[in-house]
């Protein structure tokens, strides 16, 4: 795993979303090369996977708390 990949995994959900917005802006610029666009796409894909995973973790925790409340 690369250093950049490790840093991305530690990123907060909010920072990941902000970076995704930045990537979209960069990819929409006509001066962004094809190679740069591909690198940005790969970074965005990794960030989206991390965000989806965090959302699933939060949903599972909410369900767990809700189930505990129902059992009480």
From Swiss-Prot:
This is Exodeoxyribonuclease 7 small subunit. Belongs to the XseB family. Gene3D superfamilies: Exonuclease VII, small subunit. PANTHER family: EXODEOXYRIBONUCLEASE 7 SMALL SUBUNIT (PTHR34137:SF1). GO terms for biological process: DNA catabolic process. Heterooligomer composed of large and small subunits. Its main location: cytoplasm. Transmembrane segments: none annotated. The gene is xseB. Its EC number is 3.1.11.6.
